[in-house]
């Protein structure tokens, strides 16, 4: 209703101003600004819906000030360009319409009415309401009733008798199981759901709407609100260190806790969270690659669901035979947005909707089959009678190719329980949320019926039942939940441990690299993660007087304040203010002690602008002084004009990447020498080893042969045509996720370059 009212007010404002207000520059500018704000707000809402599937939520507030890198970003570039072009066109059209009667005399009354209607349209818009609520949530001090509702359970289960298998289905919300809306989409897992305790109204709340947040909510009974962006939690050394979570209780009760997934455990700090709360046995992509049947059978995120669930079954068998009490948690990945992935062993590889194949529905149908196969193996085993099986979605599906169809339904998270000891078949329509999952499991296992803000849906009352405005209430508790981190409020001294790649201050520990904004009463950590911008881009958003401490590889800050360190990959510490003074210190000891020193200086806006502009230079445009191309640092030597076909810097160098160009091309600013030696330190990837690799300068071509280990080769070139471009053509680029950023599409690797040097020959 508010959308219609808001749009009606917007339209009325446009029409009244265009046909009645007349000519006046100030009123035109004011009305266009407010109407433009309405357009921007609604486009922001549309864009946020596209990325999150949940409007302008807590995650969007972070994304608005940081670049989105990570899973499937290339799939969002075209919509992003479309939004920018559409916004430009709308503003142009709006200005043209408002000035239609610019030759008529100004009318104060109609101008005022048009402006008031425009302001009303903004105030009535859902986007404005969502942003207002988010901003309020950032500035609140908390809610006095938090302590009354947050309850810590007993640290043990008195007499545990059941093992636990807990399956997180990536984005596998309950909506998919509506057979009327999506016929025969989930027959295998749907049948199992109908055999157990099926909780049909599991709501998604703020701070529970992405994987690590859903895991924290379901195991600790609190949303994931932190002093930093949630997916950047890989940089912390402990996770809600004071809280009692399900894993802690299980471990204290004699359980061995296991977690198995196909993706890298470090992503979003799942390893830190689980290790902080009772899990001693973790298996992700790195741990599984030495034990799975086919280590090369992977998708963009890691191992496919059939591989992961096979390993989970082996672990279930092994643990059950041992007779020890255990919990086994597993997380699937094949249903990850935007398209999902199809395991090769499932029978349901294709699902048509609206008369055409739909990749996301196909991935859901395949993944649910794999999950059902795993559960049926457990049910058929002699150990089922001692086992509780839980299946839940980690969060609602984000914007995938099925999302517009999901939005036509009443959407809820999946949560059902199959008890081997006491079969129960019932659909429970009680209002609940993700935070109730852990408390419900704890209740079934014989423990308390509460966990944090969660309550057992079998014997307690959910916060979703107590509070009709539970989303707003959750946001009101946000400051209270952030305080549970016990995060320091000051930073005077710090220690850098090079062996562990950690920084410690005021009792807290973070992984490097790290950027910190330091004020009188707050220290704000800004870690680098798969979903955040590089730290230098985050620093570029700081105000001129903001105090910062930036710990990163020396070459990343060298172009600003320490050119002598431009080729150093050691750790450096920079601190100061962008508009004031900055210092760079080289970390030259294994354990390095530092102190913060922020001088109260006069802010120089020219210096500030120069620093910001330099920080925002993209990697490929960075230039450094050197007599060779060093590939393990960003940028290129000053003599290089541009280059292509080369991937990002890694600790050893850079790979060629045929996704960026079929050949490695390095164009120099000036012609290469008439006679020169080309000294190449490099290695080959896969089938490119021991194969002739063409290297061309102008009309002359030499052959390079590389192995799988780094070697140095010298090629002799004559350059009579004064060519300025070096071209290297890997013969057989290989599509692989080797060394890839989690969630990115595979790269096509050919050769790995460490250094290329041009040495002029005399004569």
Curated annotation (Swiss-Prot):
EC numbers on record: 2.7.8.20
Database matches in Gene3D superfamilies: Alkaline Phosphatase, subunit A (3.40.720.10)
Principal location class: membrane
Topology class, membrane: Multi-pass membrane protein
Functional note: Transfers a phosphoglycerol residue from phosphatidylglycerol to the membrane-bound nascent glucan backbones.
Protein name: Phosphoglycerol transferase I
Gene Ontology molecular functions: phosphatidylglycerol-membrane-oligosaccharide glycerophosphotransferase activity; transferase activity
InterPro entries: Alkaline_phosphatase_core_sf, DUF7024, OpgB, OpgB/LTA_synthase_biosynth, Sulfatase_N
Chain ranges passing through the membrane: 1-21, 26-46, 77-97, 108-128
Superkingdom as given in the UniProt entry: Bacteria
Species the sequence originates in: Escherichia coli (strain K12)
NCBIfam families assigned: PRK03776.1
Key words, A-Z: Cell inner membrane, Cell membrane, Membrane, Transferase, Transmembrane, Transmembrane helix
A GO CC annotation given for this chain: membrane
Subcellular location: Cell inner membrane
Record's catalysed reaction(s): a phosphatidylglycerol + a membrane-derived-oligosaccharide D-glucose = a 1,2-diacyl-sn-glycerol + a membrane-derived-oligosaccharide 6-(glycerophospho)-D-glucose
PANTHER family: LIPOTEICHOIC ACID SYNTHASE, PHOSPHOGLYCEROL TRANSFERASE I
Keyword presence, Chaperone: no
HAMAP family (UniProt xref): MdoB_OpgB
The protein's annotated pathway: Glycan metabolism; osmoregulated periplasmic glucan (OPG) biosynthesis
Homology family: Belongs to the OpgB family.
Pfam families given in the database record: DUF7024, Sulfatase
Taxon lineage: Bacteria, Pseudomonadati, Pseudomonadota, Gammaproteobacteria, Enterobacterales
GO-annotated biological processes: glucan biosynthetic process
């Amino acid at each position: 209703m508010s959308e219609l009212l808001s749009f009606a007010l917007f339209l009325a404002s446009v029409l009244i101003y265009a046909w009645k207000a007349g000519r006046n520059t100030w009123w035109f500018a004011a009305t266009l600004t407010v109407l433009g704000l309405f357009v921007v707000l609604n486009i922001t809402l549309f864009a946020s819906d596209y990325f999150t599937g949940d409007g302008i939520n807590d995650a969007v507030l972070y994304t608005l000030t940081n670049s989105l890198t990570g899973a499937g970003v290339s799939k969002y570039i075209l919509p992003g360009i479309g939004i920018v072009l559409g916004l430009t066109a709308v503003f142009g059209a709006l200005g043209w319409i408002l000035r239609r009667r610019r030759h008529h005399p100004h009318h104060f009354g109609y101008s005022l009415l048009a402006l008031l209607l425009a302001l009303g349209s903004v105030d009535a818009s859902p986007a404005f309401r969502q942003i207002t609520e988010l901003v309020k949530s950032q500035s609140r001090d908390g809610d006095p009733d938090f302590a009354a509702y947050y309850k810590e359970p007993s640290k043990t289960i008195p007499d545990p008798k059941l093992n636990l298998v807990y399956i997180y289905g990536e984005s596998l919300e309950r909506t998919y199981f509506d057979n009327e809306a999506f016929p025969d989409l989930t027959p295998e897992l749907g049948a199992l759901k109908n055999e157990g305790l099926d909780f049909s109204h599991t709501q998604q709340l703020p701070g529970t709407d992405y994987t690590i947040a859903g895991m924290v909510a379901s195991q600790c009974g609190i949303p994931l609100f932190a002093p930093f962006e949630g997916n950047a939690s890989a940089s912390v050394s402990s996770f809600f260190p004071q809280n009692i979570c399900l894993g802690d209780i299980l471990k204290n009760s004699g359980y061995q806790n296991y977690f198995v997934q196909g993706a890298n455990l470090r992503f979003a700090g799942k390893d830190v969270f689980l290790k902080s709360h009772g899990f001693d046995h973790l298996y992700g992509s790195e741990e599984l690659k030495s034990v799975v049947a086919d280590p090369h059978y992977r998708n963009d995120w890691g191992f496919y669901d059939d591989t992961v669930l096979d390993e989970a079954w082996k672990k279930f068998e092994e643990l059950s035979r041992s007779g020890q009490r255990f919990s086994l948690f597993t997380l699937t990945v094949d249903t990850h947005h935007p398209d999902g992935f199809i395991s090769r062993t499932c029978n349901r590889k294709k699902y048509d909707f609206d008369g055409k194949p739909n990749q996301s529905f196909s991935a859901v149908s395949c993944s649910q089959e794999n999950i059902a196969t795993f559960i049926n193996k457990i049910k058929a085993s002699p150990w089922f009678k001692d086992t509780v099986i839980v299946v839940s979605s980690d969060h609602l599906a984000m914007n995938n190719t099925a999302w517009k169809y999901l939005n036509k339904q009443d959407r809820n998270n999946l949560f059902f329980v199959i008890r081997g000891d006491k079969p129960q078949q019932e659909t429970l329509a009680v209002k609940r949320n993700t935070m109730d999952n852990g408390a419900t499991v704890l209740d079934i296992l014989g423990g308390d019926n509460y966990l944090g803000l969660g309550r057992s849906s079998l014997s307690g009352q959910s916060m979703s039942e107590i509070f009709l405005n539970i989303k707003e209430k959750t946001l009101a508790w946000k400051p209270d939940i952030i305080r549970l981190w016990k995060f320091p409020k000051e930073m005077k001294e710090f220690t850098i441990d090079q062996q562990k790649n950690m920084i410690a201050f005021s009792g807290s520990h973070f992984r490097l690299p790290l950027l910190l904004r330091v004020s009188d009463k707050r220290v704000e950590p800004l870690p680098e993660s798969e979903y955040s911008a590089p730290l230098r881009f985050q620093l570029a958003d700081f105000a001129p007087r903001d105090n910062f401490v930036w710990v990163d590889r020396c070459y990343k800050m060298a172009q600003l304040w320490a050119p002598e360190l431009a080729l150093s990959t050691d750790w450096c510490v920079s601190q100061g203010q962008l508009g004031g003074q900055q210092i760079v210190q080289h970390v030259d000891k294994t354990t390095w002690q530092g102190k913060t020193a922020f001088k109260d200086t006069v802010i120089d806006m020219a210096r500030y602008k120069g620093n910001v502009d330099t920080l925002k230079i993209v990697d490929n445009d960075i230039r450094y002084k050197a007599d060779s191309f060093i590939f393990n640092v960003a940028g290129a030597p000053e003599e290089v004009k541009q280059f292509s076909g080369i991937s990002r810097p890694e600790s050893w160098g850079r790979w060629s990447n045929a996704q960026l160009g079929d050949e490695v091309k390095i164009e120099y600013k000036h012609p290469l020498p008439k006679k020169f030696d080309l000294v190449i330190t490099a290695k080959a990837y896969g089938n490119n080893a021991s194969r002739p690799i063409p290297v061309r300068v102008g009309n002359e071509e030499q052959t390079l042969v590389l192995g799988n280990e780094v070697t140095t080769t010298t090629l002799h070139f004559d350059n009579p045509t004064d060519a300025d471009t070096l071209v290297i053509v890997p013969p057989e680029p290989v599509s692989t996720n080797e060394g890839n950023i989690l969630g990115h599409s595979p790269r096509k690797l050919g050769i790995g370059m460490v250094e290329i040097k041009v040495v002029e020959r005399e004569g």
